[in-house]
Design a protein with these regions (language model features):
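Hydrophobic alpha-helical membrane segments
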Residues: 2-298
Length: 298
């Protein structure tokens, strides 16, 4: 649901959400220590470009062979990304603990709170299940990207075989066949990418509260991966678009992080995550208020 119904879903003041994040960061100047490890992984991931390891000639091979080459190229970056997600969730857990108990001292050690024997297995399974669900929703988009690369490969191959390009005889059978095949692949790729994003983006925001709910559930000793994902979907009904708007407001900070090759993440990552935590707490208050108003047990 991409719109906000006033009666059912009270609107969240995003300006207040960002202000709360800035205030908390100002009150805790050593907060960057909690996000030191995930920030370092952000910098590392910026130097990982799996596309450089994929030769375009691979596209001539059968689909399963192409999938194998792509999987090998992306395996290490995906592993780094997943470790970064676990570290970031652990940092969020430490931040939530700090919000509850201001006497807690921010440190790098606190950011490893979810790596103990009791919490790590539930954290790992929950985040892995979230990744798997989002991967399933991204399949149309991934197929569209594959067809887009393949159509680009066909175009380059055709130009290589016809150095007289673009001065071609458009009436020739070979040219007509190429234009038809290229057009079909290119059109199919655009349709799949557009439809894929329409399917994927709402699901991305539906599961956006998983990490915060996981931290909350771990304290209660009730960290069931499926239940956490289901609760996140329930929480975000009526709030997906507001979260999307919040991400748009954070876009300049994402851009600043990108142009500094991730170095700015030491300062930006704590602010961005505190903003998302403030948003989560606002959604949680709204959800609890709604439950109590309807006399439903939580």
């Amino acid at each position: 649901m991409w719109y906000n119904e006033r009666m059912k879903y009270p609107k969240i003041d995003l300006k207040t959400v960002r202000l709360q994040a800035r205030q908390f960061q100002a009150e805790n100047p050593r907060l960057f220590l909690v996000y030191l490890l995930p920030s370092m992984l952000v910098i590392l991931s910026g130097f990982l470009n799996p596309l450089e390891r994929i030769n375009e000639s691979v596209l001539e091979q059968p689909f399963l062979s192409v999938f194998g080459h792509v999987f090998q190229a992306y395996l290490f970056p995906l592993l780094v990304s997943f470790i970064g997600t676990v570290l970031l969730t652990s940092s969020v857990y430490a931040t939530l603990t700090l919000m509850k108990d201001s006497k807690t001292e921010p440190s790098v050690k606190n950011s490893l709170a979810l790596f103990d024997e009791e919490r790590f297995s539930q954290t790992f399974l929950t985040l892995l299940l979230k990744r798997f669900y989002l991967f399933l929703w991204s399949i149309p988009n991934l197929l569209g990207i594959y067809l887009l690369f393949y159509s680009s490969f066909l175009a380059k191959k055709f130009v290589t075989l016809h150095p007289e390009f673009p001065n071609l005889d458009l009436s020739s059978v070979e040219t007509e066949r190429f234009l038809m095949v290229f057009g079909l692949y290119f059109l199919a790729s655009l349709i799949l990418i557009i439809v894929g994003n329409i399917l994927y983006i709402p699901q991305y925001y539906a599961y956006s509260q998983v990490e915060f709910l996981l931290c909350y559930s771990l304290d209660l000793g009730q960290a069931s991966p499926r239940r956490i994902l289901k609760t996140s979907r329930s929480f975000m009904k009526g709030y997906k678009f507001q979260h999307f708007v919040l991400d748009l407001q954070l876009l300049p900070w994402y851009f600043l992080n990108w142009i500094t090759f991730g170095i700015a993440s030491f300062l930006l990552l704590p602010y961005i995550q505190c903003t998302k935590i403030s948003f989560y707490r606002a959604v949680l208050r709204a959800a609890l208020s709604k439950k109590y108003q309807l006399n439903y047990p939580w």
